[in-house]
């Protein structure tokens, strides 16, 4: 905590901060075999990040989308071969991984999940809890993962699925800021743009089948109004919206996802908590995306450095659009669907997500310090009474984030540039000259 405050106060450099807070995990060859299964959420994710880091050192170029099945097959074969070889190095070479996992935050995140879901005791035949959760927390200052939990804690000798990065689920409305709203804020929308919430002939309905009429965009996001997201996405086009997710390495975008249903989270495969955390972290980071990892460096048995992490930033959203999205999502916490997750003494922004029949619940949000994404549901999708983004996911998010920010100074979000009256008047004049609004939902 002391080092964190010193870093934010500018008294120590980022490198000094990590030297002071870094955790060491020494990897040794598993006792039984190189393929022995690993139970810890930290271990599974760390091994994966470290293996991919060594692949990167070998010059491997990671890809997620391909022009043909032949190209995809060829890539998959090359990936599997090198992944296996690099993982064998980790297990047999006496390597040490220096990771950015904060063990105190890891404990807090695990406890938040376990405590919130302790009332759900049903288990599957293999002894795994049916009701599950996963979450990822990212340090916004560095871009590194500081905590990752792949499921509820329980005694098991079997392989434990790390749902935080190995499972893909429907995100519901939590995807709207990344896929619809921030892209449209780049194209001229503002938090105050008036949009029309009305019943659509061929589109979704709102909760309780109620419609608010002419409302500011801020209100539409805060109350997760489906018709507005649908209309704005229709104007944006799925192709344009999904490209933002691809630019942030969302790995499971399928051909069938190029429909308006994805504006409400209706994906073929889905997204992972890790992807959602890194996407929201990009919004907090003024639109700059950083590939998530927990590996800082790797050394061999002779203490020679074989890998040093260097996170590169990629602009995904324009700065002002990202800041406007952040400002809008503070309203989600103040007066919208995320009210129950609002932190007591720390400015925060976030978004809920709930899928059809309450099979999945999400809460994704951030402060200036940390971004955390939480998913709750069953491994085999099942309707859960009272499951929504504003219930169990929000409870987990708030419990963890409250603990993570204990003792930290309150930090306000950075302001966005206000549109000048001249710009607004010119915009209105152009719309009138063309006798139609420049945006599908804009009410003149």
Where are the predicted features?
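Second-shell loop/turn segments in exported
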Residues: 1-3, 7, 30-37, 92-100, ...
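Structured segments of extracytoplasmic/periplasmic soluble domains
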Residues: 2-10, 20-23, 27, 53, ...
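Short active-site loop at a secondary-structure junction
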Residues: 131-133, 156-178, 191-194, 261
């Amino acid at each position: 905590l002391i080092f964190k405050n010193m870093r934010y106060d500018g008294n120590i450099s980022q490198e000094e901060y990590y030297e002071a807070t870094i955790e060491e995990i020494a990897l040794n060859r598993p006792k039984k075999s190189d393929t022995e299964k690993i139970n810890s959420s930290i271990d599974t994710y760390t091994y994966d990040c470290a293996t991919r880091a060594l692949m990167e050192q070998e010059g491997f170029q990671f890809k997620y989308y391909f022009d043909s099945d032949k190209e995809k097959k060829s890539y998959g074969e090359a990936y599997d071969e090198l992944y296996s070889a690099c993982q064998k190095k980790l297990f047999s070479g006496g390597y040490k991984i220096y990771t950015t996992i904060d063990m105190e935050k890891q404990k807090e995140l695990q406890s938040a999940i376990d405590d919130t879901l302790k009332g759900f005791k049903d288990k599957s035949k293999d002894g795994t809890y049916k009701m599950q959760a996963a979450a990822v927390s990212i340090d916004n200052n560095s871009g590194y993962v500081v905590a990752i939990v792949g499921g509820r804690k329980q005694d098991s000798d079997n392989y434990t699925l790390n749902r935080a990065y190995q499972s893909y689920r429907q995100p519901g409305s939590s995807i709207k800021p990344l896929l619809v709203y921030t892209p449209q804020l780049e194209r001229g929308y503002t938090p105050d743009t008036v949009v029309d919430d009305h019943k659509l002939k061929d589109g979704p309905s709102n909760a309780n089948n109620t419609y608010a009429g002419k409302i500011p965009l801020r209100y539409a996001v805060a109350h997760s109004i489906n018709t507005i997201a649908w209309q704005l996405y229709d104007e944006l086009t799925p192709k344009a919206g999904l490209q933002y997710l691809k630019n942030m390495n969302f790995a499971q975008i399928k051909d069938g996802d190029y429909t308006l249903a994805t504006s409400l989270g209706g994906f073929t495969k889905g997204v992972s908590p890790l992807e959602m955390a890194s996407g929201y972290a990009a919004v907090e980071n003024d639109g700059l995306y950083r590939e998530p990892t927990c590996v800082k460096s790797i050394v061999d048995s002779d203490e020679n450095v074989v890998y040093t992490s260097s996170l590169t930033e990629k602009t995904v959203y324009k700065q002002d659009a990202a800041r406007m999205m952040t400002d809008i999502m503070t309203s989600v916490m103040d007066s919208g669907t995320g009210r129950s997750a609002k932190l007591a003494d720390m400015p925060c922004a976030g978004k809920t997500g709930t899928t059809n029949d309450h099979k999945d619940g999400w809460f994704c949000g951030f402060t200036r310090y940390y971004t955390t994404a939480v998913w709750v549901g069953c491994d085999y999708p099942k309707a859960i009474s009272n499951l929504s983004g504003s219930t169990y996911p929000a409870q987990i998010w708030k419990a963890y984030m409250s603990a993570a920010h204990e003792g930290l100074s309150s930090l306000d979000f950075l302001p966005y540039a206000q549109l000048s009256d001249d710009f607004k008047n010119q915009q209105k004049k152009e719309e009138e000259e063309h006798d139609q609004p420049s945006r599908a939902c804009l009410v003149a």
